[in-house]
């Protein structure tokens, strides 16, 4: 995967999040270790919205999971608005709660 293709995946995810949460739901997928995913919103509130979107909408969770699988090794350090997300926990939270 080259940089252009990676940016396209991020753009696709961003568009879906914008549709779900409004234009302020900006995020960056930073990387993952095992099944822990690191995402960052512009603010803590937006990061929380992203986590909500991941739990509520399986398509968002699946896209972010795919990003993590395809782009292993992406890594960075950010401030307090970074969230570590354990995918097993999200799947467990979401199972049986689809309406």
Regions found by a protein language model. Name each.
Residues 1-99:
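Solvent-exposed interaction surfaces and binding hotspots enriched for charged
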């Amino acid at each position: 995967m080259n940089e252009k293709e990676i940016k396209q995946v991020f753009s696709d995810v961003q568009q879906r999040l914008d549709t779900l949460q409004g234009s302020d739901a900006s995020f960056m997928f930073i990387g993952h270790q095992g099944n822990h995913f690191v995402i960052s919103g512009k603010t803590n509130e937006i990061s929380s919205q992203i986590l909500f979107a991941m739990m509520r909408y399986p398509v968002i969770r699946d896209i972010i999971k795919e990003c993590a699988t395809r782009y292993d090794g992406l890594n960075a350090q950010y401030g307090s608005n970074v969230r570590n997300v354990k995918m097993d926990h999200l799947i467990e939270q979401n199972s049986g709660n689809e309406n």
